[in-house]
């Protein structure tokens, strides 16, 4: 009888082991999640602004230099305006062609000299 009572008393000491639950304080290690601040490294994506280098493609605007071919229109005007001799037509067309490095247009030459005889037409017409 005496032994049983002592065993029961010793068993009551067991609940003191609940103090071991204070080990939950170890969960404060979650503070280590503050390492997520390292995600601010995503700001490195601002390097995409480097794509602004595509502006260099604007250099294709240099193709506008083809507008210089509009000088051919000048040949048409000069050929039509001259109603004089075929030599005048020929000279004016050669002036236009030499300044733009292009050959005289035969059809323009023929139209401008259609009222002339074969002898009066300049060479190439």
From Swiss-Prot:
UniProt keyword DNA repair present: no
Main location: secreted
Signal peptide: none
Keywords recorded for this protein, A-Z: Cell adhesion, Repeat, Secreted, Virulence
Region (23 X 3 AA approximate tandem repeats of G-Q-I/R/S): 11-79
Annotated knockout phenotype: Impairs the formation of the hypoxia-typic morphotype, increases surface adherence and reduces the hypoxia fitness.
Pfam families in the cross-refs: Collagen
Entry's induction text: Expression is regulated by the hypoxia responsive morphology factor A (hrmA).
Subcellular localization: Secreted
UniProt function note: Hypoxia responsive morphology factor that modulates the expression of the subtelomeric hrmA-associated cluster (HAC) containing genes that alter the hyphal surface (such as reduced total chitin or increased beta-glucan exposure) and perturb inter-hyphal interactions within the developing biofilms, resulting in a loss of vertically aligned polarized growing filaments.
PANTHER family membership: COLLAGEN ALPHA-1(XXV) CHAIN, SI:CH211-266K2.1
Protein name listed in UniProt: Subtelomeric hrmA-associated cluster protein cgnA
Origin species: Aspergillus fumigatus (strain CBS 144.89 / FGSC A1163 / CEA10) (Neosartorya fumigata)
Gene that encodes it: cgnA
